From Swiss-Prot:
Pfam family of the protein (one): Glyco_transf_28
BP term (GO), one: cell division
Protein name: UDP-N-acetylglucosamine--N-acetylmuramyl-(pentapeptide) pyrophosphoryl-undecaprenol N-acetylglucosamine transferase
Gene that encodes the chain: murG
Lineage of origin: Bacteria, Pseudomonadati, Pseudomonadota, Alphaproteobacteria, Hyphomicrobiales
Entry's Gene Ontology molecular function annotations: UDP-N-acetyl-D-glucosamine:N-acetylmuramoyl-L-alanyl-D-glutamyl-meso-2,6-diaminopimelyl-D-alanyl-D-alanine-diphosphoundecaprenol 4-beta-N-acetylglucosaminlytransferase activity; undecaprenyldiphospho-muramoylpentapeptide beta-N-acetylglucosaminyltransferase activity
């Protein structure tokens, strides 16, 4: 399919692969042939990726300071660059799109050397290292939270938002229904593995400190690590609080839609899903996140009025008890927060990302694309 091929490149984690998969679906629906370049580890769980072909490209990280390890990493990336150049020469893609992670460096760098239009998508409000290295060279930057009007690359940045799952789009149709003064109050608590561990300690204790009249209103859904699941469930049972505790929820989107309040970490996907569905949140950024990207992501929602940020070191059980007590007594405030969160949601992120991809593939500049979009 000469001239109608797009090459996508994503690092070997779900966080990088998911937005690439969402774009692939959208591009294929528009008649494009889609290929994926990734590292060997990702090929194990990219079997359902909607690509005409998946290409394993050599790559490596520079996590070690050992000279031999650095040399080995450099050689792997050089091999990946040569492989990527050969792949681009064969496929002749109209554009190459990267989604972060070190495995994107060889294909994107090779594309810029071959003067193929290039785009990187950054999920977070702070650029990751691979995207930051590529930013000066690429044609365009699509951002989940990156501003279009500020920063060294603002002139070629388009705020597309982050693609979300179809289940999230479906859940976004559920309007927020505030809890009445004495009615059931549904609290959803979730996070990554470390997030679930911390919340497993502090949330049950905060609930214990609540007045009995408020505890009786609570219905809690909480993610917990397998080793914490039993103790967390027992803690709620002892308090007489109805709770559903599990290491994983396959229907998380509908759980968010059912919640009156969400307590969570603030990874890019989490913040994007909360915003699209439109629910008030207490966000606790993971304190050890690289480049503090979770804090920056949370700020985007807080600035809109849809969330309150509490650093982990300040989230004591007593502090959380106070936040819950205020929230349970302020249904109008929570409804306003839900509306504010939804106002910054981007349910059309996949479509916008495909629009930018097609624009650069046709030779259009970001400035021209923005002008056309605003006309």
């Amino acid at each position: 399919m000469a001239g109608r091929t797009i090459l996508l490149s994503a690092g070997g984690t779900g966080g990088h692969l998911f937005p690439a998969e969402a774009l692939a679906h959208e591009l294929r629906a528009r008649g494009w042939s889609v290929h994926l370049a990734t590292d060997k580890r990702a090929t194990r769980f990219a079997g359902t990726f909607p690509a005409d072909e998946i290409h394993a490209i050599d790559s490596a990280t520079f996590g070690s300071r050992n000279p031999l390890a650095l040399l080995k990493s450099g050689l792997s990336i050089w091999r990946g660059f040569k492989q990527s150049t050969a792949l681009i020469n064969r496929l002749k893609p109209a554009a190459v799109v990267g989604f972060g992670g070190y495995p994107t460096l060889p294909p994107l760098y090779a594309a810029t050397r071959r003067q193929v239009p290039t785009l990187v998508h950054e999920q977070n409000a702070v650029m990751g290292r691979a995207n930051k290295a590529l930013a000066p060279r690429v044609t365009a930057i699509a951002g989940g939270f990156l501003p279009e009007s500020d920063g060294p690359f603002a002139s070629k940045t388009v705020l597309t938002g982050n693609p979300v799952r179809p289940a999230v789009i479906q859940a976004s149709g559920t309007p927020y229904a505030p809890s009445s003064g004495r009615g059931v109050f549904r609290l959803l608590v979730f996070g990554g593995s470390q997030g679930a561990q911390y919340f497993s300690q502090v949330v049950p204790e905060a609930v214990r400190l609540l007045p009995a009249t408020l505890r009786s209103r609570l219905r809690i859904v909480q993610q917990a690590r397998p080793e914490d699941e039993g103790p967390v469930r027992s803690a709620y049972d002892e308090l007489g609080v109805k709770a559903e505790v599990s290491p994983f929820f396959t229907d998380l989107a509908s759980r968010i839609a059912d919640a009156h309040l969400v307590i969570s970490r603030s990874g890019a996907s989490t913040v994007s899903e909360i915003a699209v569905i439109g629910r008030p949140a207490i966000l606790v950024p993971y304190p050890y996140a690289l480049d503090h990207d979770q804090a920056a992501n949370a700020t985007a929602l807080e600035r809109a009025g849809g969330a309150e940020i509490v650093p982990q070191e300040k989230l004591s059980a007593e502090r959380l008890r106070g936040l819950l007590e205020v929230a349970m007594g302020a249904p109008d405030k929570l409804a306003a927060m839900a509306a504010a969160a939804k106002s910054v949601g981007r349910p059309d992120a996949s479509r916008l990302l495909a629009d930018v991809t097609e624009a650069i593939a046709s030779g259009e500049t970001v400035t021209e694309f923005k002008r056309r979009r605003s006309a």
